[in-house]
């Protein structure tokens, strides 16, 4: 039974039968209550006469189905989310009327009631296969069509879709919106957003002289925090940059950006109607890192309007190309067209995600085999985004920037409003550059894993370099040695105590060894850095002298990107057991006071948290945790008044507080009996402090209720749920565990908040959670039977007891995980993959704890 799945073979067969989908006409009725909505679909399509195929619809109540004027029995032909279509004509008309169901998981048509004012909001999220939860479809990207949408909504609601929003017609107590027909597009990038959204409008002139209407919207209760001017400015800069880079005008008629609640992703590139999670509407003062991340997301989705929406992959095996391209282009635009000129440092931070994913036992080639929709879901990861984008950056260097964009222009022009493949793109790039990309594609795109680069320095008696070579080895099994375009540089301290670059060479590194000619004969620098400028995608090692220098002189590296590469190399060595966790903590805590790039500071603080939580040896953990909390609190107190760093360090100190003295200091900040000059103790920061206090037994239910009463919002209630789950007590943890596993009415964001609170004491009293190892594996099969894929995936990951690995002698998380896999060979590929990855995380933790123990 297919269930919700679709195989590539089925999609290929259906596309061979359906020669074209002429048009969709869709009517939705959103006035029928809070559980169901009306859905009528009329599809005109051409097919091979006499053949049979199927359409897709997820609905528990199909009222009528008509094919070419003949009524079909819904009970007979609508089975397993498919509508059987037999004995097709050359020209066909399918009409389906159904009641579809609102979702609360961010899939299909999501419905949300704002606790701040009781207003209801809806929005769609269709990637990968969820348009079929809203209307009848041929749910695959290569069966493109036009869409004409009519929506009946409660009076006062605004409705947005891919075409411009028309003036509504009154119909009793409802408004009816009749949208114009869209451009040709795939079903997964169609959109419906409806509710009492409020916002700001503007216009811009496209490169072909058209006026493009812009809109930025959010819920009424948070619209006061919507800094639309900043968002519109980034959007204008992105339009100008992308139209210039692609040589093609914006391909749709308008551009709305709508910030929506309880989103299960960051954003979605629906054509001309982009949705974002409304955590990007900052209700308190954002850090520079948060502003840059939002700008990058805005540009990422805008880049998709050409690459992904105008030209779309034929099948999901090229999803990586879609996302990697947008990831690369957004950072390029960020650095070259906006005020966020250090955008490539943020790119380096994102690369951390890809490198981690690439070292898991489930790593896959960038061009992974996607046999069905289940494969899409499990391969939508750091390789799809971060590694792919890094490899595209290498490709730009390999073929040359001018040739890259010339080839890209030809690709987008030839396949406009149609579908294409990776081979189509590579052929255009090869033609534009004159380079044969077959061998490059094989080692970079068709093989999994990562290689490791290491400097080997031979020094003469007089201190000069006789030979500097970069060796390359296949760190991952099966990975070939790859060509890399990157910089290698040397740095030394000056007499004034500053750090100066004494040589740099940008070159192609290929094969097992590459000699750096620029270094020959010069005095050995204090520090040698492979991948200076972060052009490459590889694991990079520091030689022994350079590592020692970095530990003692990290504050001397004034360029954020250089500093970031140094810190990334040190962290990678820590993860691989070549640098004890406590040594990394010493380096990182020395780097924090001088870190002026907030994206890099965010990453460093995240790595500090991870090192203390998982890599420090059990016998040293209490001491290391207390020392880390103390030093972070001191750094917070000495940070620049009112700075982003001050705010981030206060939050980090609270997360890492362990001693009575530290909790007393956090409590004094929370109560206002002690203050830090310039620190704005806003409601978001107060929640972070309060959750930490609850974790340490320094705050109560009364404190939670008092703060929640002042923050009667979605975010406030989610934070309160996290705080309540963070309370100590066996019955409290048992209640949280039961609710997140059984109560399907809980919104996912609230569920994730509760789980974060559940594990609050895992670092200080891990043995208290020992019983949940068995309970987790007993519940695992039921999770995948009860919840949708996205929810099941997150539950499986967030409830996994990796926090106990190595720290609770009476349980063996690794052995339990392996035993579960052995006993459940018939489990879904997605489930098995996640458990294998989490077992690997635990094995790495235990190995690194042994290294740290000495």
Task: For each feature predicted by the language model, list its residue ranges.
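N-terminal, polar/Ser/Thr-rich
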Residues: 1-38, 115-121, 141, 438-442
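Glycine/proline-rich low-complexity spacer/linker segments in large multi-domain proteins
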Residues: 8-16, 97-148, 195-200, 534-560, ...
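Hydrophobic helix-coil surface modules that form long, contiguous segments used
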Residues: 39, 126-129, 137-299, 328-331, ...
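Surface-exposed beta-strand/loop patches in extracellular or lumenal glycoproteins
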Residues: 42-59, 139, 148-154, 423, ...
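A surface-exposed beta-strand-loop module
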Residues: 53, 57-115, 136-139, 512-524
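Beta-strand-rich binding/interaction modules
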Residues: 61-68, 437-438, 450-531
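Hydrophobic alpha-helical and helix-loop surface patches within well-folded domains
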Residues: 70, 179, 215-479, 603, ...
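Long, ordered, helix-rich scaffold segments
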Residues: 351, 382, 465, 478-480, ...
């Amino acid at each position: 039974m297919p269930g919700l799945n679709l195989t590539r073979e089925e999609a290929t067969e259906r596309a061979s039968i359906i020669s074209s989908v002429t048009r969709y006409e869709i009517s939705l009725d959103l006035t029928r209550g809070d559980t169901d909505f009306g859905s009528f679909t009329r599809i005109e399509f051409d097919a091979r006469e006499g053949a049979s195929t199927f359409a897709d619809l997820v609905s528990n109540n199909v009222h009528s189905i008509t094919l070419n004027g003949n009524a079909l029995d819904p009970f007979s032909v609508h089975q397993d989310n498919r509508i059987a279509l037999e004995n097709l004509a050359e020209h066909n008309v399918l009409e389906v009327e159904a009641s579809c169901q609102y979702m609360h998981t961010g899939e299909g048509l999501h419905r949300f009631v704002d606790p701040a004012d009781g207003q209801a909001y809806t929005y769609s999220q269709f990637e990968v296969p969820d348009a079929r939860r809203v209307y009848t479809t041929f749910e695959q990207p290569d069966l493109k069509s036009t869409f004409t949408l009519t929506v009946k909504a409660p009076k006062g609601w605004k409705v947005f879709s891919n075409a411009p929003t028309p003036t509504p017609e009154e119909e009793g107590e409802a408004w009816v919106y009749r949208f114009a027909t869209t451009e040709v597009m795939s079903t997964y990038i169609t959109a419906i957003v409806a509710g009492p959204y409020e916002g700001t409008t503007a216009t811009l002139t496209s490169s072909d002289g058209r006026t493009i209407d812009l809109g930025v919207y959010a819920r009424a209760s948070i619209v006061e925090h919507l800094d639309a001017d900043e968002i519109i400015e980034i959007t204008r800069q992105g339009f100008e940059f992308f139209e210039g880079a692609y040589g093609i005008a914006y391909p749709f008629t308008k551009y709305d950006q709508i910030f929506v609640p309880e989103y299960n992703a960051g954003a979605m590139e629906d054509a001309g109607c982009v949705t974002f999670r409304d955590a990007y509407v900052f209700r308190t003062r954002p850090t520079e890192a948060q502003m840059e991340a939002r700008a990058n997301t805005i540009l990422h989705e805008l880049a998709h309007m050409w690459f992904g929406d105008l030209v779309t992959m034929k099948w999901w095996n090229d999803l990586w190309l879609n996302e990697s391209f947008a990831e690369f282009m957004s950072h390029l635009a960020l650095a070259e067209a906006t005020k966020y000129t250090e955008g490539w440092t943020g790119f380096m931070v994102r690369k951390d995600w890809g490198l981690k994913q690439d070292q898991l036992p489930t790593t896959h080639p960038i061009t992974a085999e996607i046999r069905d929709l289940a494969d899409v879901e499990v391969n939508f990861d750091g390789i799809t985004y971060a590694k792919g984008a890094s490899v595209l950056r290498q490709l730009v260097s390999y073929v040359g920037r001018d040739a890259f964009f010339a080839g890209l222009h030809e690709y987008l022009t030839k396949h406009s409003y149609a579908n294409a493949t990776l081979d189509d793109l590579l052929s255009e790039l090869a033609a534009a550059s004159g380079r044969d990309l077959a061998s490059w594609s094989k080692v970079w795109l068709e093989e999994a894993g990562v290689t490791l680069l290491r400097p080997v320095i031979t020094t003469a008696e007089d201190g000069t370099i006789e030979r500097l070579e970069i060796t390359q080895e296949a760190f991952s099994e099966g990975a070939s040695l790859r060509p890399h375009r990157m910089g290698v540089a040397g740095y030394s301290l000056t007499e004034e105590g500053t750090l100066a670059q004494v040589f740099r060479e940008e070159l192609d590194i290929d094969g097992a060894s590459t000699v750096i000619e620029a270094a020959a004969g010069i005095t050995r620098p204090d520090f040698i850095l492979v991948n200076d400028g972060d052009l490459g995608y590889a694991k990079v090692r520091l030689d022994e002298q350079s590592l020692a220098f970095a530990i003692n002189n990290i504050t001397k590296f004034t360029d954020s990107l250089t500093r970031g590469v140094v810190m990334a190399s040190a962290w990678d060595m820590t993860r691989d057991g070549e640098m004890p966790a406590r040594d990394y903590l010493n380096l990182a805590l020395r780097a924090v006071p001088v870190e002026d790039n907030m994206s890099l500071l965010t990453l460093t603080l995240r790595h500090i948290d991870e090192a203390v939580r998982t890599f420090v040896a059990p016998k040293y953990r209490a001491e290391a945790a207390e020392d880390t909390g103390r030093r972070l609190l001191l750094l917070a107190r000495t940070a620049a008044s009112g700075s982003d760093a001050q705010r981030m360090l206060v939050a980090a100190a609270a997360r890492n507080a362990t001693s009575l003295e530290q909790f007393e200091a956090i409590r004094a900040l929370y109560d206002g009996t002690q203050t830090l000059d310039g620190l704005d103790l806003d409601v978001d920061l107060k929640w972070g402090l309060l959750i930490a206090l609850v974790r340490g037994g320094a705050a109560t239910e009364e404190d939670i209720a008092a703060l929640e009463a002042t923050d009667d919002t979605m975010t406030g209630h989610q934070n309160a749920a996290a705080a309540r789950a963070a309370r100590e007590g066996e019955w409290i943890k048992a209640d949280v565990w039961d609710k997140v596993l059984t109560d399907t009415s809980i919104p996912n964001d609230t569920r994730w908040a509760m789980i974060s609170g559940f594990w609050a004491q895992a670092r200080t009293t891990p043995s208290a959670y020992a019983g949940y190892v068995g309970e987790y594996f007993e519940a695992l099969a039921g999770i995948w039977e009860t919840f949708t894929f996205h929810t099941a995936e997150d539950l499986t990951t967030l409830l996994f007891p990796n926090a106990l690995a190595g720290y609770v002698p009476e349980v063996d998380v690794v052995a339990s995980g392996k035993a579960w896999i052995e006993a459940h060979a018939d489990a879904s590929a997605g489930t098995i993959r996640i458990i294998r990855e989490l077992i690997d995380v635990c094995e790495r933790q235990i190995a690194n704890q042994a290294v740290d123990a000495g």
